[in-house]
Amino acid sequence: MAAGVPCALVTSCSSAFSGDQLVQHILGTEDLIVELTSNDAVRFYPWTIDNKYYSADINLCVVPNKFLVTAEIAESVQAFVVYFDGTQKSGLDSVSSWLPLAEAWLPEVMILVCDRVSEDGINRQKAQEWCIKHGFELVELSPEELPEEDDDFPESTGVKRIVQALNANVWSNVVMKNDRNQGFSLLNSLTGTNHSIGSADPCHPEQPHLPAADRTESLSDHRGGASNTTDAQVDSIVDPMLDLDIQELASLTTGGGDVENFERLFSKLKEMKDKAATLPHEQRKVHAEKVAKAFWMAIGGDRDEIEGLSSDEEH
């Protein structure tokens, strides 16, 4: 593995579906290129993420079990994708054994994948409760219920959602593209579809790119079971510099599309993400909610549209 290349660690806790198969789905090909390693059990699949905002060279690192995770791999993990068998009542037990490592890595993207949830094994409620507790997003490869065709904001599902989440992550070696004047859309992509800035919505059903107002509303959707948090607690948790950070972020997002502006926007997002990563898990969610609300106000959003939103609301 090339030094300094970030990775999305992919593993499977099911004997019927391997991590390599999941990588095939993500890359959309069965003809995979694998980097040679000293340990044949661990495989690195190079992947260049290339979208309209940035490009980044990463590895999809397939690790069959947690005992094969080396210090080098641990240092490079920036996303964690784990597959489990939803038809087995004990399907989440093996996944839970990875939690100490995931908590040490604190990756911004953590996805729990299954073919589909099952009433005879792990049902949707149990899977989502587990996700909420541990900061994951649930993705079904073959969901029983698909989004309505006439939905104004159809949800991404299956492998498409996994690819979308990995594209939305701010990878450490990201290279900005300088020919785009879409700062606000960039922020939507980076903070509205995944767990950037502190896992604000750990187990929402697969979520599309939303306008700012809808995105802010969605922070409180599908969050049953989150702990009660008062405004005073929020204010005591966040960094005193947060308000200044928000104002700068808003200015960069609504400003011009020159290269320097984009680079500063990415730098500020990375800086805020790193700050949030130092907080305990529950505080990270509260921090992310405050960031979303404050940002909405900073760009001129209507307070009425987000009034009353908090992490203890249930829908």
UniProtKB/Swiss-Prot annotation:
User: Which biological process, per GO, is one annotated for this protein?
Assistant: protein transport
Decide whether keyword Protein transport is in the record. yes
List the residue ranges of the region (Disordered).
197-233
Output compositional bias ranges, type Basic and acidic residues.
203-224
Instruction: Write the record's keywords in alphabetical order, separated by commas.
Output: Cytoplasm, Phosphoprotein, Protein transport, Transport
Record localization:
Cytoplasm, Cytosol
Q: Which InterPro entries match?
A: Alpha/Gamma-adaptin-bd_p34
Q: Which Gene3D superfamilies match?
A: 3.40.50.11960
Q: Which Pfam family, an example, fits this chain?
A: Adaptin_binding
Its domain of life reads Eukaryota
Where on the chain is Phosphoserine found, per UniProt? S310, S311
* GO CC field: cytosol
Functionally, this protein is described as follows: May be involved in endocytic recycling of growth factor receptors such as EGFR.
| Subunit-structure text | Associated with AP-1 and AP-2 complexes.
Q: What is this protein called?
A: Alpha- and gamma-adaptin-binding protein p34
